[in-house]
Curated annotation (Swiss-Prot):
One of its GO terms (biological process) is defense response to fungus. The lineage of its organism: Eukaryota, Viridiplantae, Streptophyta, Embryophyta, Tracheophyta. Belongs to the LEA type 2 family. One of its GO terms (cellular component) is cytosol. This is Probable desiccation-related protein LEA14. SMART domains: WHy (SM00769).
Length: 151
């Protein structure tokens, strides 16, 4: 009897892994705003939905790392839905306080940029499967603002 249950579990697990799932990628990370307290970057994420109906996004959570340190994080509750059989573009604002940027002076160096890693968890609600988190990550360099960005 136990082996029958194990076979049933394996069968269901195999079928669930074969179900197509939405996939995403970070397409760009750009400077959005500079103010007295922080720098705001905008991460552009594209997500493809293989299903013929829209899928609600429950939450977007993200962490922004540089030089092995977390320099920004946040959550965006209920940001909308993924379009049916289409690509959906999502904008994720990432705010980094200047106090943290100044602590990264070693990484900034001569070229006035920071190396980053952005990790995003896109939590969606799939029928039958339930809540499912799509992990999306990106690594790259971002130029820091200069005085001309302020004026």
């Amino acid at each position: 009897m136990a082996s029958l249950l194990d076979k049933a579990k394996d069968f269901v697990a195999d079928k669930l892994t074969a179900i197509p799932k939405p996939e995403g990628s970070v397409t760009d990370v750009d400077l959005k705003d500079v103010n007295r307290d922080s720098v705001e970057y905008l991460a552009k994420v594209s997500v493809t939905n293989p299903y013929s109906h829209s899928i609600p996004i429950c939450e977007i959570s993200f962490t922004f790392h540089s030089a092995g340190r977390e320099i920004g994080k946040g959550k965006i509750p209920d940001p909308g839905s993924l379009k049916a059989k289409d690509m959906t573009a999502l904008d994720i604002p990432v705010v980094v306080p200047y106090s943290i940027l100044f602590n990264l002076a070693r990484d900034v160096g001569v070229d006035w940029d920071i190396d980053y890693e952005l990790q995003i968890g896109l939590t969606i609600d799939l029928p039958v499967v339930g809540e499912f988190t799509i992990p999306i990550s990106s690594k790259g360099e971002i130029k820091l603002p200069t005085f001309k960005d302020f004026f």
